[in-house]
A protein has these predicted regions:
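Long, contiguous interaction/targeting segments characteristic
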Residues: 1-48
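Aromatic sugar-binding surface patches on proteins
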Residues: 125-134
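Beta-sandwich strand segments
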Residues: 24-27, 156-161
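Extracellular/luminal low-complexity segments enriched in Ser/Thr/Pro
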Residues: 134-140
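Short beta-strand segments enriched for Tyr within beta-sheet-rich domains
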Residues: 140, 144-150
Length: 173
């Protein structure tokens, strides 16, 4: 869910960071981000269907633990690690429907099991009608290229997206 906001079509982002040492000597570090479009401004309108990771991305994480996210997008999976979520976004106020997808190891062609999360089946009811996540149900191997194939309907028009990305061994922020 947090990825959606980080790649949203807002025009302004505010960032604040603070650290605190508690009385029992525990360090707490907080990062606060505010995404907004000021009153009187217009959102940046994406053209067509967009994804993240993007074609050619090499700094995506290979693993993601849904239970570490709040709210949890896959509470039924427990504490297991899965692959990095692949975000799909259609133009604002249009529906993504009839989505089908596959994620394959590009070199060997082996399919990665996936789950497609949309506004229709989101357990937390957080996704908009133009949002979807493709969730690989196993961690992705660092340094290996994965091919992603997506088809569906956006704004009443059929679309298809094909791209590849390579998870990094470590992701430094």
């Amino acid at each position: 869910y947090h990825l959606r906001e980080q790649v949203s079509t807002v025009t302004d982002v505010g960032i604040a960071h603070g650290e605190m040492l508690s009385l029992d000597n525990v360090y707490t570090s907080r990062l606060q981000m505010l995404f907004a479009t000021p009153t009187g401004s217009t959102w940046q309108a994406p053209m067509g269907v967009l994804t993240y990771p993007c074609d050619g991305t090499t700094a995506a994480a290979g693993a993601f633990t849904p239970s570490s996210e709040s709210p949890n997008p896959a509470p039924d999976l427990g504490a297991i690690s899965v692959g990095t979520p692949i975000y799909v976004r259609g133009p604002a106020n249009t529906a993504l429907t009839s989505l089908a997808a596959s994620v394959k190891l590009a070199a060997g062609g082996s399919d990665v099991p996936i789950r497609i999360l949309t506004s229709a089946n989101d357990p937390q009811a957080m996704l908009y009608i133009n949002d979807a996540f493709i969730l690989p149900l196993q961690p992705l191997q660092a340094g290996q290229t994965y091919a992603v194939f997506i088809t569906g309907i956006s704004d009443g028009q059929a679309f298809s997206k094909t791209f590849s990305f390579t998870p990094a061994a470590t992701v430094s922020w």
